[in-house]
Structures are given as C-alpha cells and as structure tokens.
Amino acid sequence: AGLFTGRWCILTPPSGTDPDAVARLREFWNALGSRVEEMDPAHHDKVLAIVSHLPHIIAYNIVGTADDLETVTESEVIKYSASGFRDFTRLASSDPTMWRDVCLHNKDAILEMLSRFSEDLAYLQRAIRWGDGEKLFDLFTRTRAIRRSIIEAGQDTAAPDFGRHGAQSVDIKAGE
C-alpha cells in the first residue's frame, strides 16, 4: 500500500498544458504519498539519463564484457566476481524490453550522457596510464564525497522514506 510513499514523481507537462489538469495530477500523486515535482521534459530526460539510464546501460555492458572475457580468462571472471561486481551489476537483471524501449525513446539524452561519461572515462584512463596518482586521488576523493552526500540525503536505501524515519511526504514545487 505504500509503494509511492516518499518516492519522487516528476511531472513533465508540455507547454500549453492545462494548469488545472497538472494540479489534479499533482493532487493524485500527493494522495498516494509521492513527492511531486515538475520539470521541463528535456531537462527530465537528461537528469534521468545520468542517474538511471546510464547506470543500467553500463551495468549491462560490464556484464557483457565479463562474459566475453570468460574464454580469455578460462572462466575465472564470473568465478571470482565478488560483492562489488554483484552489487554494481544488479541493474543488469532489469527487464531487457523496458531498457531497450528506454534507450530508443530517450536516445538523444542517453547519447549525450554516454559521450560525457566517455570523456570522463578517458580522463581516468590517462591518469592511470600516466601513473598520475594525484589526479586519481583527487577524483576518488571528490567522488567519494559525492557518494557520501547521497547517503546523507537518504537516497541509498529502499525504505519508503529513504531511511528518514518519520519523514513525511511533502509537496515540492520546482524551484524550491
């Protein structure tokens, strides 16, 4: 019964949408306990491309790469995969039909984020190749701090209120 309690619902009304219709939809989701916010559709697509679509695509890809390497490593990739690989690749167990459709329908934003990710990955490759420990340390320190801020925001748990005990569903409007 609490499937939507404390969860985000992002409305993406196109320009010209009847404000009363948006208000009714907002009320509907609020009544289900969702945290409702509005976003421009193109902005929504970019945000979801980086925080949802890209992680799924990368997980599918790394599982495929590991499987391809099985013959080279004599079946030791899967054999020795531990919790890090398991946790990271959990997303690859998602519905392939849904992710095919997501990729086809949000391809521009996904391709933009893949391009950015590829640039960042190339930066990481160069730092490793050149033995640039300072760049590696700076990158890992910065991104660890970002990950910790995600935990502090309560976004790292499946709990209905993201682990914020006693948190109430709130109506959040864009720009607040």
What feature does the model see in each segment?
Residues 3-90:
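Internal alpha-helical scaffold of NAD(P)-dependent oxidoreductase catalytic cores
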